[in-house]
């Protein structure tokens, strides 16, 4: 999504993913043996996610107490982008009328990176559920690939300065 939308006015660049959780649709994270530990070991930086409890570590406490996989995929997608140097933080997950299907929405800076982060987050969570770990080579590759997307889509220094000045003055802009 680009521009103000149903999900947010303040965060105009959003990935909207329709996620069918299949076998884990009715399981909360506390019902998956070893999932919390595997997630916290794989992405220890998730400790910085506040989530609804409103404090550092809030998201991981939700995972420990039990939250649904769509919510976890949202946070993992955001964290993978953060590890690649992209300042993102907005996300929402909502159940649809179709059982086991969720709408997962999260912010991106670079659209290709956002799409990649969505796929990588699903892959990472699925691996933790089925094997209890995420291969270290994959964990190194994902942020590296995301950083490449970020760098490929980055503005040059002079254009960046013009864009920041326009934003300060609340002048709209569009990437052409």
Regions found by a protein language model. Name each.
Residues 1-175:
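Preference for protein termini
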């Amino acid at each position: 999504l680009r521009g103000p939308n149903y999900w947010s006015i303040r965060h105009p660049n959003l990935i909207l993913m329709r996620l069918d959780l299949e076998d884990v649709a009715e399981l909360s994270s506390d019902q998956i043996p070893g999932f919390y530990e595997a997630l916290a070991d794989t992405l220890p930086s998730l400790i910085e996610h506040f989530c609804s409890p409103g404090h550092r570590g809030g998201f991981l406490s939700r995972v420990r107490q039990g939250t649904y996989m769509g919510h976890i995929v949202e946070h993992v997608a955001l964290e993978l982008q953060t590890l690649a140097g992209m300042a993102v933080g907005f996300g929402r997950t909502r159940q649809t009328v179709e059982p086991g299907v969720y709408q997962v929405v999260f912010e991106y800076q670079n659209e290709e990176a956002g799409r990649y982060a969505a796929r990588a987050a699903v892959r990472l969570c699925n691996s933790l559920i089925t094997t209890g770990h995420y291969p270290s080579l994959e964990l190194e590759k994902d942020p590296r690939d995301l950083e490449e997307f970020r760098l490929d889509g980055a503005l040059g220094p002079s254009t960046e300065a013009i864009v920041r000045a326009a934003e300060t003055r609340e002048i709209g802009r569009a990437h052409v």
